[in-house]
């Protein structure tokens, strides 16, 4: 074949090497840790992603998780449904997002989209991304953070939007979580391996942060004995941030269009993954 459209299946070196006519791989999504990049590079194959399709859906999902945790959605919902309405004054208090500090770690399309939505909530927005200039971040209403570790104790919410690679694997560990504010909400809708799940579970059990929202896991699906599945301070979803009707439609169209555009020499550079 000359082109492959792929979602979550593994595209190994063996498969890529055996596809002698393969010229382009179009990923149904923006992550590509399921594709052997070295083999892709060695075989001079172009890797494209649906760069413009999923930002709105993922940014909305991040806010959904942020609100759900801040407002203790699970607990308050269960209180009403189990006939304990009168216990409302005894429940742990919720928190507001207005005027709170949020750190967006990774400032690609999703991070930029999230910033716009957080501005509507009148949050104070900080951005960590070594590859984006202070001027560009300031232009859209954010404040650039140069040292991730030093900023953690000032943030009320942290949302991860980085790729998973050797530099970001287990970037968020126990020591880093210990530096966060006790009322901090940690959200990951990027890639599971960026957060050390064992460390996160320990930190949640020790009440080091307010709560965590995960749409992604180190192992998917997570095993049933993963303690985060039973942790009341963890708000979880099944890697479903993009599963809106609108987003899936956009992604499907863009995946195919990327292949067509490649062979028509019209594929946008912003949709091509630069493999170093």
Predicted segment positions?
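A short helix->loop->beta-strand "cap" motif at the edges of active sites that frequently abuts
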Residues: 19-24, 43-46, 122-123, 182-184, ...
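Glycine-rich Rossmann-fold phosphate-binding loop(s) that bind the pyrophosphate
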Residues: 107-108
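Rossmann-like dinucleotide-binding domain for NAD(H)/NADP(H)
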Residues: 47, 183-276
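Phosphate-coordination loops involved in phosphoryl transfer and adenosine-cofactor binding
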Residues: 22, 98-101, 174, 183
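Rossmann-like adenosine-cofactor binding region
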Residues: 12-16, 132-227
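Short, Asp-centered acidic motifs that coordinate Mg2+ and/or phosphate
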Residues: 2-3, 24, 157, 185, ...
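Phosphate-binding beta-alpha-beta segment of Rossmann-like dinucleotide-binding domains, i.e.
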Residues: 43, 51-101, 113-116, 120
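An N-terminal-biased, well-structured beta-alpha scaffold segment characteristic
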Residues: 1-48, 153, 173
């Amino acid at each position: 074949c000359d082109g492959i459209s792929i979602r979550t299946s593994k595209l190994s070196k063996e498969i890529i090497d055996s596809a002698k006519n393969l010229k382009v791989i179009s990923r149904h999504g923006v992550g590509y840790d399921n594709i052997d990049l070295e083999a892709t590079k060695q075989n001079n194959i172009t890797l494209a992603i649906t760069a413009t399709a999923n930002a709105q859906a993922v940014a909305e999902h991040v806010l959904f998780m942020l609100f759900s945790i801040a407002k203790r959605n699970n607990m308050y919902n269960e209180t009403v449904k189990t006939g304990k309405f009168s216990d409302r004054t005894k429940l742990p208090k919720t928190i507001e997002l207005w005027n709170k500090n949020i750190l967006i770690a990774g400032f690609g399309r999703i991070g930029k989209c999230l910033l716009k939505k957080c501005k509507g909530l009148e949050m104070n927005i900080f951005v960590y991304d070594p590859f984006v200039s202070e001027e560009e971040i300031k232009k859209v209403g954010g404040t650039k953070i140069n040292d991730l570790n030093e900023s953690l104790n000032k943030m009320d919410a942290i949302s991860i939007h980085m790729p998973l690679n050797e530099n970001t694997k287990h970037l968020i560990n126990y020591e880093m979580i210990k530096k966060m504010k006790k009322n901090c909400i940690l959200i990951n809708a990027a890639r599971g391996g960026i957060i050390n799940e064992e460390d996160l579970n320990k930190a949640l059990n020790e009440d080091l942060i307010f709560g965590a929202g995960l749409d992604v896991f180190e192992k998917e699906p997570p095993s049933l004995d993963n303690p985060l599945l039973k942790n009341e301070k963890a708000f979880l979803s099944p890697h479903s941030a993009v599963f809106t009707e609108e987003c899936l439609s956009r992604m499907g169209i863009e995946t195919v269009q990327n292949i067509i555009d490649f062979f028509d020499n019209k594929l946008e550079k912003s949709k091509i993954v630069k493999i170093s």
